[in-house]
């Protein structure tokens, strides 16, 4: 088994010359390699809808973790329910932070997402994912190279130093248009916020719509020197 510790033995390669640009091959390998010791960390963005559909074809009872920060858009929570109805066999876990919002405010002050967004992300996303990955060998992410400068060198299989894990990214070669083409082709549910200028959807407090021609991550932590929550630093 390929693990964080045995990374030097990595000789896995995949062709992107197929209908899913390698995504199904990568997922098939991942579930064969890690069996029950792999989880998909899903934010329920539009890429997530594609991955859930593909994962359901490979492993209908796969584990899916949603990092419920308690400050997501209502539309996101409603979408999760639609996904549960569409893919009833998937094991969707809504992972809660250790601190409630009130407890966080008592310790660190109100609106931590404004005063210290890095700490807020650590408490409400990074630490919960660390807990979720504690007993896993690998995790799946919907990163695409096209999304931003910080993601353009992502590979199908990555040694993840942040979580000392293997990060599997099946959609790295997909374009924004290809993602949407797949969603429409398979009549997949998606977050209606995408239709009103939100290409990337995170917490309600830290996500704004993006103007025409903007980077897909421009609406995240707008006005701050921050483009990532910290889950995907290598």
Curated annotation (Swiss-Prot):
GO annotation, cellular component aspect: cytoplasm
**Cofactor mode of binding and number, as noted:** Binds 1 [4Fe-4S] cluster per subunit.
Q: Give residues annotated as binding [4Fe-4S] cluster.
A: 120-121, 203, 206
Annotated Pfam families: PAPS_reduct
Entry's CDD domains? PAPS_reductase
Source organism's superkingdom? Bacteria
The record, for Gene3D superfamilies, names: HUPs
Q: What class of enzyme is it?
A: oxidoreductase
For this UniProt record, give its keywords in alphabetical order, as a comma-separated list: Cytoplasm, Iron, Iron-sulfur, Metal-binding, Oxidoreductase
What catalytic reaction does the record list?
[thioredoxin]-disulfide + sulfite + AMP + 2 H(+) = adenosine 5'-phosphosulfate + [thioredoxin]-dithiol
Protein's job? Catalyzes the formation of sulfite from adenosine 5'-phosphosulfate (APS) using thioredoxin as an electron donor.
Put simply, this protein is called: Adenosine 5'-phosphosulfate reductase
Tell me which species this is from.
Bacillus cereus (strain ATCC 10987 / NRS 248)
**What high-level taxonomic lineage is stated for the organism?**
Bacteria, Bacillati, Bacillota, Bacilli, Bacillales
